[in-house]
C-alpha cells in the first residue's frame, strides 16, 4: 500500500515519473541493494559489476573503507576492520563480551550500556558501522539509478527484538536513508517467490545467513502473505560453521587455541574458503602456516551437525506454533548463503519431505523481495497491492500485583496491531500507577524481560478497584512498540515509545520460548498461588479498613473476635504455598463478614436518606 506523500505547491512529481526506492538486505556477512527496473526486481551492481557487498568496514584515520577491500585487510588490521557487526546491533556490552572469543575487538562501554569499538578513527558504535555499510549501498543505488532515493525497505531477521530493530532504523537515518519499512527477511523471500511463481498454500522460509537463523511458516493466498509463526536463533549461522572448521584445523595441527587477532582472522578466512569449495567438491586441501591437511565433505557434515540440528529444532517448534502439520507444507524456500551447504539442503529436505526451492539465488532473494515491496510503498504500483502480515516473536504485556505478567498481545499476533486492556487500582486513594512493560512467555515478571517503565499520575482518589485505567499497546509495521495509559473518568494520560538501550542476549529469545514450554505447569501453579495471595491481601486490607471505621458501632465483641480469628488464619496461610487452602480461607473470611457488609450498606443507605421526604426520593 502506497505511502501518501505531500509536496509543496508546484513540486509534486509528474504522474508518469517513478519514485526511486530500493530494497536493502543488511546481512551479517554480505549486504545487497536491489530495485525494480523495467518491471523486474534485480540487485544493483557496483562500478566493477559486483552485486554482493561484504559487510565489512575498515577504519583509517580520515576515511572508512567498505566492502571487499576492507574484508581482505581483516587479517592484517583486525582491530580497525569490523565484520559481522549485525551480531552487535541492539546489544549491551555484557552481551557482546559473551562473544569475546569470536570478536577480536577492543570494546568500551558508552551511555546506556551500548558497546563502542576502539578504532584508529575513534570510538565506533555498531549503529555507526552499519550506517557506513548502508551509506555505501545508498551511493551505489543512486549512481546506478541516476537519482535521489525517496526511501528504502530494509530487511531484518524476524527474530530481531525491539532494540535491534530500532538500532537498524537509527543506522539508516545516519546513512541518510528514509526507511519506508523494516521487513522481516522471511517475508521478503516470500514476496519474491510469491510474485515470481504465483504460489499459494503453506510455505516454510528457511533462512540461514552468516550470523542469524530464521524459520517462518507462511500462508500465501492471492497476494496476501500471512506469517503464521516464526522461530529461529539470533546467534546461529555460517560464522559458526567457519569457527567449527577453524577449531578442527587447530586440533589437527596441534596449535594453541589462544591465537592473536590477526592469526584468528586469517584462519577464519581459510575456513570460510574451504567451506565454500566443499559446496561443489568432495574434499579440499586446507593449509595454515606449516600445516596442511585434507578436509572432506563428510567431516564438514560432522562438524556442523550440531548447528544444523539446532536449526531443525527451531523448524519443528515453528510448525507446531503455526497449528499445521509438516505434511501440509507444500514448499520450502531456502534463503541465505549458508543454505548452499549440501548438508543443510539435505537435512531440510528430509525434515519437510520435499526438495527445497533454490530457483532464486539465496543470497539475492531477500533483497529482491524488499525491492518489490519498496516499489509498492513508493507508489509505483498503482494497480497492484501486497498485503504483508508479519507477526511479533514474543508476547508483550505488563506487570500486575503479585509480580504477575499479564499478556496484552500474545506472540505470533499479526502486526501492525493495537490492543487495549483495562486495569484498576489496588489501594484506597491510589493516585498514581507504575506501568511496567514486559516481553516474554512466562507467567511471572522475574522470568520475563523488562522493556520499559513509566508512571501514570493524577488518578482521582477512589476506593480500591473503582478507577478504570485503559492501557493500550501498539506495535507498528516495523515491529516497534508504543504503550499508553489513560484513566477514563479524568482523562489523565501518559505514554512511552519503547526504545530499550540494548537487545536480548544470544539465544535468549529461543531460551524464553523453550522455558515457556518446559515450565508451563510450574508457571501456572505459581501464577495461581500469586493470584490467591494478592486476593488474600486485598481482602484483609478491605476488612481491616471496614473494622477501623464501623467495627465498634456495628459488631458485638463475639463477632469481632470471630472475624479477627479468620483474618489471622488467612494471614498465616497467605505466607505459605497451599493455593487451595488460601482460596478456601478467603471464602470463609468472606462468609463471616457478609452480615457486617450488609449492616454497613444499610447504615450507608439510611444516612443518605435521612431527613428527606418520600416525594423527594421518588423524584
UniProtKB/Swiss-Prot annotation:
Signal peptide: none annotated. GO terms for molecular function: ATP binding; ATP hydrolysis activity; ATP-dependent protein folding chaperone; unfolded protein binding. InterPro entries: ATPase_NBD, Heat_shock_70_CS, HscA_NBD, HSP70_C_sf, HSP70_peptide-bd_sf, Hsp_70_fam, ISC_FeS_clus_asmbl_HscA. Keywords: ATP-binding, Chaperone, Nucleotide-binding, Stress response. It comes from the Bacteria. CDD domains: ASKHA_NBD_HSP70_HscA. SUPFAM superfamilies: Actin-like ATPase domain, Heat shock protein 70kD (HSP70), C-terminal subdomain, Heat shock protein 70kD (HSP70), peptide-binding domain. GO terms for biological process: iron-sulfur cluster assembly. Chaperone involved in the maturation of iron-sulfur cluster-containing proteins. Has a low intrinsic ATPase activity which is markedly stimulated by HscB. PANTHER family: HEAT SHOCK PROTEIN 70KDA (PTHR19375). NCBIfam families: HscA, PRK05183.1. Belongs to the heat shock protein 70 family. This is Chaperone protein HscA homolog. It comes from Pseudomonas aeruginosa (strain UCBPP-PA14). The lineage of its organism: Bacteria, Pseudomonadati, Pseudomonadota, Gammaproteobacteria, Pseudomonadales.
Amino acid at each position: 500500500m502506497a505511502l501518501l506523500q505531500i509536496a509543496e505547491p508546484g513540486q509534486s512529481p509528474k504522474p508518469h515519473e517513478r519514485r526511486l526506492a530500493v530494497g536493502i538486505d543488511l546481512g551479517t556477512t554480505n549486504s545487497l541493494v536491489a530495485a525494480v527496473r523495467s518491471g523486474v526486481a534485480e540487485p544493483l551492481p557496483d562500478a566493477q559489476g559486483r552485486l554482493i557487498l561484504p559487510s565489512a568496514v575498515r577504519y583509517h584515520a580520515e576515511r572508512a573503507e567498505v566492502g571487499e577491500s576492507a574484508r581482505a585487510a581483516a587479517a592484517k588490521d583486525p582491530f580497525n576492520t569490523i565484520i559481522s557487526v549485525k551480531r552487535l546491533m541492539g546489544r549491551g556490552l555484557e552481551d557482546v563480551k559473551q562473544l569475546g572469543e569470536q570478536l577480536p575487538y577492543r570494546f568500551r562501554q558508552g551511555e546506556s550500556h551500548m558497546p563502542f569499538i576502539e578504532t584508529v578513527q575513534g570510538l565506533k558504535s555498531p549503529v555507526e558501522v552499519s550506517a557506513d555499510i548502508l551509506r555505501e549501498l545508498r551511493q551505489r543505488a543512486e549512481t546506478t539509478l541516476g537519482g535521489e532515493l525517496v526511501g528504502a525497505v530494509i530487511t531484518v531477521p524476524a527474530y530481531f527484538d525491539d532494540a535491534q530493530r530500532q538500532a537498524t532504523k537509527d543506522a539508516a537515518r545516519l546513512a541518510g536513508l528514509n526507511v519506508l519499512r523494516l521487513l522481516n527477511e522471511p517475508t521478503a523471500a516470500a514476496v519474491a517467490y510469491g510474485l515470481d511463481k504465483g504460489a499459494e498454500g503453506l510455505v516454510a522460509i528457511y533462512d540461514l545467513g552468516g550470523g542469524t537463523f530464521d524459520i517462518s511458516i507462511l500462508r500465501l493466498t492471492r497476494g496476501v502473505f500471512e506469517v503464521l509463526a516464526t522461530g529461529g536463533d539470533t546467534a546461529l549461522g555460517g560464522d559458526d560453521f567457519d569457527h567449527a572448521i577453524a577449531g578442527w584445523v587447530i586440533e589437527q595441527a596441534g596449535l594453541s587455541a589462544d591465537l592473536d587477532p590477526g592469526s584468528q582472522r586469517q584462519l577464519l578466512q581459510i575456513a570460510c574458503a574451504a567451506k565454500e569449495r566443499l559446496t561443489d567438491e568432495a574434499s579440499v586441501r586446507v593449509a595454515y602456516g606449516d600445516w596442511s591437511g585434507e578436509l572432506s565433505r563428510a567431516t564438514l557434515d560432522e562438524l556442523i551437525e550440531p548447528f544444523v540440528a539446532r536449526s531443525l529444532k527451531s523448524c519443528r517448534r515453528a510448525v507446531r506454533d503455526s497449528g499445521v502439520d509438516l505434511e501440509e507444507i507444500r514448499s520450502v524456500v531456502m534463503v541465505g548463503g549458508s543454505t548452499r551447504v549440501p548438508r543443510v539442503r539435505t537435512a531440510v529436505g528430509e525434515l519437510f519431505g520435499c526438495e527445497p526451492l533454490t530457483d532464486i539465488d539465496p543470497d539475492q532473494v531477500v533483497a529482491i523481495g524488499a525491492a518489490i515491496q519498496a516499489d509498492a510503498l513508493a507508489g509505483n504500483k498503482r494497480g497492484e497491492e501486497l498485503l504483508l502480515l508479519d507477526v511479533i516473536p514474543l508476547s508483550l504485556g505488563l506487570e500486575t500485583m503479585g509480580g504477575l505478567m499479564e499478556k496484552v498481545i500474545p506472540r505470533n499476533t499479526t502486526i501492525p496491531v493495537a490492543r487495549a486492556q483495562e486495569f484498576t487500582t489496588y489501594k484506597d486513594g491510589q493516585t498514581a500507577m507504575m506501568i511496567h512493560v514486559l516481553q516474554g512467555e512466562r507467567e511471572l515478571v522475574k522470568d520475563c524481560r523488562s522493556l520499559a517503565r513509566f508512571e501514570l499520575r493524577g488518578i482521582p482518589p477512589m476506593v480500591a478497584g473503582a478507577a478504570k485505567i485503559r492501557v493500550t499497546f501498539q506495535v507498528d509495521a516495523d515491529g516497534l512498540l508504543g504503550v499508553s495509559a489513560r484513566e477514563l473518568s479524568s482523562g489523565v494520560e501518559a505514554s512511552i515509545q519503547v526504545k530499550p538501550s540494548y537487545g536480548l542476549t544470544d539465544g535468549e529469545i529461543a531460551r524464553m520460548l523453550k522455558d515457556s514450554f518446559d515450565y508451563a505447569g510450574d508457571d501456572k501453579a505459581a501464577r495461581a498461588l500469586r493470584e490467591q495471595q494478592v486476593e488474600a491481601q486485598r481482602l484483609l486490607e478491605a476488612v481491616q479498613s471496614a473494622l477501623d471505621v464501623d467495627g465498634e458501632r456495628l459488631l458485638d465483641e463475639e463477632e469481632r473476635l470471630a472475624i479477627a480469628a479468620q483474618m489471622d488464619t488467612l494471614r498465616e496461610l497467605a505466607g505459605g504455598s497451599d493455593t487451595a487452602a488460601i482460596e478456601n480461607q478467603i471464602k470463609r473470611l468472606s462468609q463471616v463478614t457478609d452480615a457486617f457488609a450488609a449492616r454497613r450498606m444499610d447504615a450507608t443507605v439510611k444516612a443518605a436518606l435521612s431527613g428527606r421526604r418520600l416525594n423527594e426520593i421518588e423524584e
